[in-house]
Amino acid sequence: MISAAWSIFLIGTKIGLFLQVAPLSVMAKSCPSVCRCDAGFIYCNDRFLTSIPTGIPEDATTLYLQNNQINNAGIPSDLKNLLKVERIYLYHNSLDEFPTNLPKYVKELHLQENNIRTITYDSLSKIPYLEELHLDDNSVSAVSIEEGAFRDSNYLRLLFLSRNHLSTIPWGLPRTIEELRLDDNRISTISSPSLQGLTSLKRLVLDGNLLNNHGLGDKVFFNLVNLTELSLVRNSLTAAPVNLPGTNLRKLYLQDNHINRVPPNAFSYLRQLYRLDMSNNNLSNLPQGIFDDLDNITQLILRNNPWYCGCKMKWVRDWLQSLPVKVNVRGLMCQAPEKVRGMAIKDLNAELFDCKDSGIVSTIQITTAIPNTVYPAQGQWPAPVTKQPDIKNPKLTKDHQTTGSPSRKTITITVKSVTSDTIHISWKLALPMTALRLSWLKLGHSPAFGSITETIVTGERSEYLVTALEPDSPYKVCMVPMETSNLYLFDETPVCIETETAPLRMYNPTTTLNREQEKEPYKNPNLPLAAIIGGAVALVTIALLALVCWYVHRNGSLFSRNCAYSKGRRRKDDYAEAGTKKDNSILEIRETSFQMLPISNEPISKEEFVIHTIFPPNGMNLYKNNHSESSSNRSYRDSGIPDSDHSHS
């Protein structure tokens, strides 16, 4: 009795436990009706949702909620109870604040393409295990990031803030960050403290900002000892940055800036660098030995720069020829002087560098105010046409000296013709200047009609190349300082000199353009050689045709009279063509006579008959009928062959 009661008690206990566990199992396996659930992956994307649906299974690990219309009010508070969720995709929604109520253990959060404006400590502190944060294409600004917002994000490795409204790099970023993307913002300055302590940073992308050389702090990248990739594409740099971390840097991208010079120490100690890209800049020469420390370089890309292949670039030719096969260098193509335009620097002979040329120097003195120091925003100056080194070309320039009133500042200017349409202007300043205005005008043209061209050059520059001028034409070049130090000039009257471009006939380039350069059309004011040759051939052809026609017309009537039969053998088909009618006989031609042999059954006579040829040699008719009224059944062709079946001797 006791055992039976005990059995009933155990069965009741099991039933009770089953009833308690059953709802939990059903809940764990439930899925929102608007979503699709598959082994921890919850697919609620692209459904025009305005809020996150309830009833998400507790064993969910990844939530796909992108491409909806979810706003901040649509994030339920019970979402934070999903403790197994590690990845949430909420991009392309309608969030305007950093979302709260997120699962505590989320590691990867995608919030791109929303309208998030603020990042607070309260929102980030609730997800302390976050490793990847994607905030691209939002409205985050530097002032909208709360100070210390990331102080508890000790696991954050990737922070993407591309295409926002940042003007500076946010302070207080966690030391654990390995990749930081800040491209396409409005960053114009980077101070050293903003990147201080980011010793784990490996990849830094700053493309498409407003950075210039004055906006980069001294040694701003120097302490990033683990940095392997630095990208500064599409900024306003005029010189390559210096003091780069040399321990681990492997990739450096500087293309699409306004770089016109490379400091001699720019790439010092970058022994691990294997890819360097400086394409689409304004480089015309490189300081000697600039690549000496690049022991591991394998890809050097320098396309679309106005390289001036003068004496200062001869060392580059020697360096290129000494490189091993594994090193791939692209874009070192001469753009000037004209005689080597389109040629690869590596292929130039030593004589083409003109290392013995000398220039002609003109001196200009101007009066300026008391110097102080004011630096305008760099990067706002227009990109120069082409900057060239001090390559000298004798016999192409004239001395022009203009002297102003006595002053405390002297500018020494060199003006010389480089090609028939290019002049090179260089200058030296005794005292620092912030900016100068450079202009040029073809003499004989009125400035009122827009023929004058001017540009602003920074005080850091010392030379300028003016292109697209007219050959053998006089030009007036003027220069005036816009600012010296902190005070404006009392007198901004420009000081001008006159120069002259070289004649076109002095340049006759015979080079072949490289594949990467567009071939220029051949320009020649004279009649093209091909047209002359074609015309001559046409005239000769017409003359020959006329001569042939005249000859045929003259000799056509004599053709039949001059024809004579060959003494050789003729095929039987030739007789048919000549009008000969064949009988039951075989004609056998023997030299100048032929023999007729009957093929009848009668015995052949032993007597040999010889029939002489009746064909007259001159092709005239042999038979004449003096009686026109009498008819005849025989008639002769013009060739003397009778139409009858028998020949007559």
Curated annotation (Swiss-Prot):
Give the matching PROSITE patterns. Answer: FN3, LRR
Q: Does the keyword Transmembrane helix apply?
A: yes
Q: Where is the composition biased (Basic and acidic residues)?
A: 389-401
Q: Main site of residence?
A: membrane
Region of interest (Interaction with ADGRL3), ranges: 38-67
Q: Which Gene3D superfamilies match?
A: Immunoglobulins, Ribonuclease Inhibitor
How this protein is processed and modified after translation, per its record? Answer: N-glycosylated. Proteolytic cleavage in the juxtamembrane region gives rise to a soluble ectodomain. Cleavage is probably effected by a metalloprotease.
Q: What is the effect of changing residue 64 to A?
A: Abolishes ADGRL3 binding
Pfam family example for this protein? LRR_8
Cysteine pairs bridged by disulfides in the record:
31-37, 35-44, 309-334
Q: Which residues are glycosylated?
A: 226, 282, 296
Annotated region Disordered: the residues are 387-407, 622-649
Indicate the segments forming the LRRNT domain, all copies.
29-58
Q: What is this protein called?
A: Leucine-rich repeat transmembrane protein FLRT3
Record the organism: Homo sapiens (Human)
Q: Which gene encodes it?
A: FLRT3
